[in-house]
């Protein structure tokens, strides 16, 4: 057991065949503020349990087995998520390391503070072909498996995420003396845009791609009770497993609102913020997970992940797949996050068996 230059905690069990790349499992132990006890932590503890069960059963794998607790998967004070898995893949670059929190501390400085070595990240990077396969066990963080009464999900892909800043501009005026028919109310225009986002994502989802979209940040000026809003700034986040949807969605909702904006006499501009492409799970790993579930007589279904995970970065180093288990009411990133002992055990059993299947191929 040791810590790499990126601060990832890594346990390794050697295999019987020298020179083979490792099979890797794991996740993360950090949480969002007010988060629960299963997101990420499940994958780390289940990986340890899989390694322990192999040891207790006297099962020797051909490949080395590594269990990794990746550093800082959740969004950090430095504006960077998946710090450890990005470093593992060799994509944690100088610009990211230079990002600072509100106190002025850089990500690199914070990593040094906890004992990592950001100047030596090259040693932590595995690069393409650096692993034999990666399997991450995780709660679904959604309602599908629970709703369908299924214990196991085989993840097909991890959504890409695109964020766009919209500015709706009108004209601030006196709320009491400006007639309704001549107002240029930016908030009304913003409301039309938010409604279009909801309607368009609802119409597109499942035909055939996974699509969700949210306006989760909004600010307004003058933002006082007695003035017509003159400007609204907001951030749209769209998630999909199809790059074409990510590329087109902002323009689609703008087009839907064109006539409304004209009637309301408001303008609207869009500025791209960030974009992460979708990540496909590897077919070999998906089949290994499904085969493992079948061997254990555990029903399963394929489904996409609507959340980002360390796995999407680790995919740059080798074949990647994910196992989902249900969580109560689909809740996550909250204190109510929960999975039963039986659900956790089923996921851990599938993980251990999938590693054996992958080792034998």
Regions found by a protein language model. Give the residues of each.
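Alpha-helical metal-binding/catalytic segments enriched in His/Glu/Asp
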Residues: 25-28, 34-74, 162-168, 179-201, ...
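Zn-dependent metallopeptidase/amidohydrolase metal-coordination segment
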Residues: 2, 26-27, 300-349
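Flexible, glycine/charged-enriched surface loops at secondary-structure junctions
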Residues: 4, 60-61, 121-125, 177, ...
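Short beta-alpha connecting loops at secondary-structure transitions
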Residues: 94-95, 239-242, 273-275, 330-342
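Midchain, well-structured core segments that form catalytic/ion-binding scaffolds
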Residues: 73, 79-243
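A short beta-alpha structural unit
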Residues: 214-221, 235-241, 267-286, 312
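Acidic/His- and Gly-rich active-site-bordering loop/insert found
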Residues: 1-36, 54
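Acidic, glycine-rich active-site loops and adjacent beta-strand->loop/helix elements
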Residues: 7-9, 29-32, 65-76, 141, ...
């Amino acid at each position: 057991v040791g810590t790499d230059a990126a601060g990832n905690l890594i346990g390794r069990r050697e295999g019987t065949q020298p020179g083979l790349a490792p099979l890797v499992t794991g996740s993360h132990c950090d949480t969002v503020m007010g988060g629960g006890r299963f997101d990420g932590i499940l994958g780390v503890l289940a990986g340890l349990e899989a390694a322990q069960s192999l040891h207790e059963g006297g099962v020797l794998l051909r490949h080395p087995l590594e269990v990794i607790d990746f550093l800082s998967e959740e969004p950090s004070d430095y504006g960077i998520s998946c710090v450890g898995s990005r470093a593992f893949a060799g994509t944690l670059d100088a610009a990211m390391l230079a990002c600072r929190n509100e106190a002025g501390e850089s990500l690199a400085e914070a990593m040094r503070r906890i004992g990592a070595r950001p100047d030596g990240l090259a040693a932590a990077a595995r690069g393409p072909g650096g692993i034999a396969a990666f399997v991450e066990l995780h709660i679904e963080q959604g309602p599908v498996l629970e709703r369908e009464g299924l214990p196991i999900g085989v993840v097909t892909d991890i959504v890409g995420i695109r964020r766009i800043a919209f500015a709706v501009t009108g004209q601030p005026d006196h709320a009491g003396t400006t007639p309704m028919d001549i107002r240029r109310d930016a908030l009304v225009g913003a409301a039309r845009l938010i409604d279009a986002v909801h309607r368009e994502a609802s119409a597109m989802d499942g035909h055939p791609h996974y699509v969700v979209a949210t306006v989760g940040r909004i600010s307004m000026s003058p933002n006082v009770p007695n003035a017509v809003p003159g400007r609204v700034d907001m951030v749209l986040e769209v998630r999909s497993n199809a790059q074409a949807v990510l590329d087109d969605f902002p323009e689609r909702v703008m087009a839907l609102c064109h006539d409304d904006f004209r009637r309301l006499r408001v303008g609207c501009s869009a500025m791209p913020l960030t974009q992460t492409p979708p990540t496909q799970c590897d077919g070999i790993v998906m089949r290994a997970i499904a085969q493992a579930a079948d061997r254990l007589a555990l029903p399963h279904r394929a489904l996409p992940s609507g959340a980002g995970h360390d796995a999407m970065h680790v995919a740059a180093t080798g074949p990647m797949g994910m196992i989902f288990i249900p969580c109560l009411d689909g809740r996550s990133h909250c204190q109510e996050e929960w999975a039963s002992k039986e659900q956790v055990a089923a996921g851990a059993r599938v993980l251990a068996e999938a590693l054996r299947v992958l080792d034998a191929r």
